């Protein structure tokens, strides 16, 4: 498994193309699907308002391994993307990169608006750009005046049905509170972990191979 390979310290780069659902089989709900999104297995209707759970924070799950380089990237920030790929290539250990990108068909976004949607994800704090290197956090793009997360939601048809529901404002407010609190937490972690990498047996001689684990 991915977690096992990271825990053993193998040097590799794992890139997640995060389009927030099982899109190649027809837009089913996944752990990565955001709150309020309309999918075939968590639809918006009389009794449901789409997916009710928060999007799984796979980036923090991977960062918890502590011996890893973890980063988020977006289509709209290509230089940030390239720098993180270069850093992952040079990192002596496992690297995990989460790339947020629209599925234009099932997000119901026009082909020429995918990059703009990515930009809004970053500007609304829905998809913060940051990296974690062995426990040291760094927010690579700070947003001084974030836009409301509603702007990001309105840019995609997958939220349209939910936004018409009587409980829409409650869902919007909950998501806004979540993304704001998460961003503030990242800034706090950046300050708290500055120049304080997690210490451990990260040298190559301590990497346990599958053969040794048998």
Functional labels for PLM-detected ranges:
Residues 1-27, 76-83, 88:
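Thiamine diphosphate
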Residues 2-4, 28-31, 110-113:
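Short, glycine/charged-enriched secondary-structure capping and boundary segments
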Residues 12-14, 37-42, 95-98, 121-124:
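Glycine-rich loops and low-complexity Gly/Arg-rich segments
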Residues 16, 70-73, 96-100:
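Short, conserved beta-strand edge motifs with alternating hydrophobic and charged residues
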Residues 17-21, 43-48, 101, 126-132:
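Short C-terminal domain-edge/linker segments immediately following a structured domain
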Residues 30-91:
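Conserved thiamine diphosphate
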Residues 81-214:
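Glycine/aspartate-rich loop-and-adjacent alpha/beta segment that forms the canonical ThDP
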């Amino acid at each position: 498994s991915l977690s096992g390979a990271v825990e053993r310290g193998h040097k590799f780069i794992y890139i997640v193309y995060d389009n927030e659902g099982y899109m190649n089989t027809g837009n089913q709900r996944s752990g990565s699907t955001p709150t309020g999104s309309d999918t075939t297995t968590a639809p918006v209707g009389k009794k449901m308002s789409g997916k009710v759970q928060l999007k799984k924070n796979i980036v923090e799950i991977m960062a918890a391994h502590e011996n890893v380089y973890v980063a988020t990237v977006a289509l709209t920030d290509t230089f940030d993307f390239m720098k993180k790929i270069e850093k992952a290539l040079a990192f002596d250990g496992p690297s995990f990169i989460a790339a947020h990108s629209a599925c234009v068909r099932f997000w119901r976004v026009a082909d020429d608006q995918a990059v703009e949607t990515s930009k809004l994800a970053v500007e609304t704090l829905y998809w913060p750009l940051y990296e974690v290197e062995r426990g040291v956090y760094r927010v690579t793009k700070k947003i001084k005046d974030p836009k409301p997360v509603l702007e990001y939601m309105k840019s995609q048809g997958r939220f349209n049905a939910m936004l018409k529901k009587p409980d829409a404002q409650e869902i919007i407010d909950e998501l806004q509170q979540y993304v704001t609190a998460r961003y503030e937490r990242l800034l706090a972690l950046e300050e708290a972990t500055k120049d304080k990498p997690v210490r451990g047996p990260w040298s190559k001689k301590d990497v346990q191979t599958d053969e040794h684990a048998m």
